[in-house]
């Protein structure tokens, strides 16, 4: 009996070891290239491959210029993911440029499908993430420095300098997904019931409604 249990345990360990890589990020590619056909009506867990591929499919110039930060958050995210850069389809990577006005922030958010690592191009940023145990890890970073945000954890960046700031972000997914906490809760469609949010945040319903109004 003990011998059988040992073999069962060993078999389970092998299965888990083989399955682990597939759980780490996007699925492995099965061909050299598969440039996304964004116009295809076929919707898979990803995008189908387009028939005619050129070198331009693997080129993206969108990160070289600053984005427009004239908005309430004072920041702009320029994405180089599969939706704007079809050549990364099936490759399990993507990038973004984030620009911040003085005092601007990339509000608290999560990426459910990817870890994020940033390289600071210019400026002074306070960055941080919060674990599932509600512990905050925060750091002030400047040009040339790097910080990493673990997959799925709430994180943010705040410009603490007197001038603009910018970073280049990289992700281990072709489409990392972004869920901004405030917009998710206060600008959902259909809306999250105000009494639900009032109880969660321990405030009154009119206060919740006032916050919701700011997102309209």
UniProtKB/Swiss-Prot annotation:
Stretches assigned to the Cupin type-1 domain: 61-209
Signal peptide: 1-24
Gene Ontology cellular-component terms listed: apoplast; plasmodesma
Molecular-function GO terms, alphabetical: manganese ion binding
Matching CDD domains: cupin_OxOx (cd02241)
PROSITE patterns (UniProt xref): GERMIN
GO biological process, one term: regulation of root development
Domain of life: Eukaryota
Compartment(s): Secreted, Extracellular space, Apoplast
Subunit structure and binding partners: Oligomer (believed to be a pentamer but probably hexamer).
PANTHER family (alphabetical): GERMIN-LIKE PROTEIN SUBFAMILY 3 MEMBER 3
Protein's name according to its UniProt entry: Germin-like protein 1-1
Species name: Oryza sativa subsp. japonica (Rice)
Lineage: Eukaryota, Viridiplantae, Streptophyta, Embryophyta, Tracheophyta
Gene name per UniProt: GER4
